Every structure is written in C-alpha cells, then in structure tokens.
Design a protein with these regions (language model features):
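Short acidic active-site motifs
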Residues: 7-8, 61-65, 97
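Thiol-based oxidoreductase modules, predominantly thioredoxin-like and allied folds used
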Residues: 2-4, 22, 34-41, 45-63
C-alpha cells in the first residue's frame, strides 16, 4: 500500500511499527523488489502481524524523502518504531529478508 508523507509522519508519531520501501518509477531495482515487498506484506498480514509495510514514491514526496528522511538512493527501506527510525538499508531485499527485517522492528 502506498503511503504519503503526512500519513507516514502520523504513524511515526503514534509509535507504530512500519517498514517503508522508498522508490521511483524509473528505478529498475525498485521494479525488481516491488513484487517481493508486496509478497512480504501479504505474508505478514496473513500472520496477523502488528507490523505494516508501505511504499512511498519519492517523486510524489520529494521534499519529505530527501530533506526530512535523507533518502539518497533507491530502493531504500526504512523501519520505524516507537517514534524513531530503527532500520535503514539501500538496495534490493528478497521477500524473506524483508520479513526478517520487519519482525526485528
């Protein structure tokens, strides 16, 4: 599910466990990772996990992604919990890696 900067800020302020894939439409590695991120999200939903996975198109949220979250490359995955960033990686993660990261938040 795609999320906006306003929605993400609200979830961070509420202390929710969220993992976000930051992407652009022109990024080839982003396109490769998209179905794996979606599959990981579905598996976590099926497990009734309290961790939510979202995507954010940084072209639609440029100022927030670059100035606030300091995204420099895509794909970038960031995890948030307890009101702060607790995970950051750049590059492709496979489905099981995404799930492992999410469960460690």
């Amino acid at each position: 599910m795609e999320i906006t900067s306003v929605e993400l800020e609200e979830k961070i302020k509420n202390g929710e466990k969220v993992l976000v894939d930051f992407f652009t439409n022109w990024c080839a590695p982003c396109k490769v990772m998209k179905p794996m991120f979606e599959e990981a999200s579905k598996k976590l939903i099926d497990e009734n996990s309290d961790i939510k996975l979202y995507t954010m198109n940084i072209e639609k949220n440029t100022d927030y992604a670059i100035d606030v979250l300091r995204i420099k490359n895509v794909p970038t995955i960031k995890g948030f919990f307890g009101g702060k960033e607790v995970y950051h990686s750049t590059g492709i993660l496979k489905t099981e890696q995404i799930i492992q990261v999410a469960k460690k938040l």
